[in-house]
Amino acid sequence: MNDQSPLVRIEGVSKHFGDTVALDNLTLDIASGEFVTFLGPSGCGKSTTLRILGGFERPTTGRVILDGEDVTFQPPEKRNVNMVFQDYALFPHMTVAQNISFGLELKGMSKADIRKCLDEIMTFLELDGFGARYPGQLSGGQRQRVALARALAPDPALLLLDEPLGALDAKLRGQVQQELKSIQRRTHKTFFFVTHDQEEALTMSDRIVVMNKGRVEQDGTPEELYFHPATRFVAEFIGETNLLSGEMRGQDGDTVMMDWFGQTLSGHAPGGVPKVGDTITASVRLEKLSFHSARPDVANAVQGTVVGKTFLGSRMAVDVMVADAKGAKLRAFVDAETGLSIGSDPTWIGWDSDSMAVLRD
């Protein structure tokens, strides 16, 4: 494959199940060595995409190119692709070593080569000493590593991961997230990860593709999607945000001015906006708002009164009733020890224009 060509190319892929459109003309490239996550709610098309990449489903239209070869109609066993399932799908009657060796035996490797590969992958994934154990004797994190070892041992070009952390408790899930990303970086493998969990996507991914109703809502880095969502769906699905709607007043390059309850606010709109006079909506993340005793020297500033606080450990969520805004509220994250009291004197809240993303819809 040419180094400049994508490892995976999805070209105009649609998938229909009767009258239901699971995927609607999806076109996407994935570079070699990327950790790409498909993120979205149930029924958005992310798992259907994974199954098409793995050869478990055939697209209704379009094609899939893997490493320069059209694999659209190739069965799973003919593709240089492997998969880690949500329940890991380890064979309970086989030892760890036998589970990991299973795919190597199917490839027809010699016993000596299997032994060498097994030793290397078990050392790499810190499974030395576990070879004779059975899956039922392992912790959740250990089973995760065995499933990864089995999937990586045959050296696939693409590894598909179907919500593999869903069965883990919150603490272990956080540990495995870091471990999984570390493994991907060290192996330089291309990971295609499917999840509905925004934290998993933000923590591990080089790139996130947000899906909605079979289509791509937005495709970008975790930082781009979080701080500069393109649509209302992305803004609300990833993290918590303040949504402000008002009339568009004007535009200066990528900066858009809007009227919000009689105050002029400015936001960032790199993707273009409707015409002057139209109603637009903007997103401001909670951590981008700051509190001040006097009007701050920033692009956007409003006055309000603290009406609620929620303790979240190291930080606190503060609700502010904005003055002269017909009951509109803003929510902000502050340090947990910040001395803001409910019903205290009015305070100023400020944020810059780059922190306010004007949405397409």
Predicted regions and their residues:
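Conserved ABC transporter NBD signature motif
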Residues: 62-70
